[in-house]
Amino acid sequence: MARIAGVNIPVHKHTVIGLTSIYGIGKTRAQQICQSCKVDPTVKIKDLSEEQIETLRTEVAKFTVEGDLRREVSMDIKRLMDLGCFRGRRHRRSLPVRGQRTKTNARTRKGPRKPIKA
């Protein structure tokens, strides 16, 4: 198991797909990382040399990933709620934030239906 950014990368997968198991790295960024490290994206992670894995580690360390990114996103949401802006109020009430309709849909965000008490 190769360990990059505190995450165990599955060794039986291609380099690009394995890098996407890190929170904050998608396919495009994984391809950019492989290109800048001069690593073939189709090579499986178990076939990489230790120095190639080390270059991947240093390249991934340049980005905000995993715990730091999660903390940053949660702090952004908390800031919106503290400001009391529209988006913050929608987060606080557990409603859709980006203008979706709520009369008939949004069950995932609103939770299960609550019966009306007479």
Swiss-Prot record:
Q: Which UniProt keywords apply?
A: Ribonucleoprotein, Ribosomal protein, RNA-binding, rRNA-binding, tRNA-binding
Q: Does the keyword Mitochondrion apply?
A: no
Gene Ontology molecular function: rRNA binding; structural constituent of ribosome; tRNA binding
Concerning InterPro entries, the annotation shows:
Rbsml_uS13_C, Ribosomal_uS13, Ribosomal_uS13-like_H2TH, Ribosomal_uS13_bac-type, Ribosomal_uS13_CS
Q: Which residues form the signal peptide?
A: none
Which residue stretches belong to region Disordered?
91-118
Tell me which domain of life the UniProt entry assigns to the organism this sequence originates from: Bacteria
Q: Which PROSITE patterns match?
A: RIBOSOMAL_S13_1, RIBOSOMAL_S13_2
Looking up SUPFAM superfamilies in the UniProt record yields: S13-like H2TH domain
What are the record's GO terms for cellular component? cytosol; small ribosomal subunit
Quote the PANTHER family the UniProt record gives.
30S RIBOSOMAL PROTEIN S13/40S RIBOSOMAL PROTEIN S18, SMALL RIBOSOMAL SUBUNIT PROTEIN US13M
Q: How does it assemble?
A: Part of the 30S ribosomal subunit. Forms a loose heterodimer with protein S19. Forms two bridges to the 50S subunit in the 70S ribosome.
- Function per UniProt: Located at the top of the head of the 30S subunit, it contacts several helices of the 16S rRNA. In the 70S ribosome it contacts the 23S rRNA (bridge B1a) and protein L5 of the 50S subunit (bridge B1b), connecting the 2 subunits; these bridges are implicated in subunit movement. Contacts the tRNAs in the A and P-sites.
Indicate the family of this protein. Belongs to the universal ribosomal protein uS13 family.
Write down the HAMAP family for this protein, in alphabetical order. Answer: Ribosomal_uS13
Q: Can you say what this protein is called?
A: Small ribosomal subunit protein uS13
Q: Which source organism does the UniProt entry give? A: Francisella philomiragia subsp. philomiragia (strain ATCC 25017 / CCUG 19701 / FSC 153 / O#319-036)
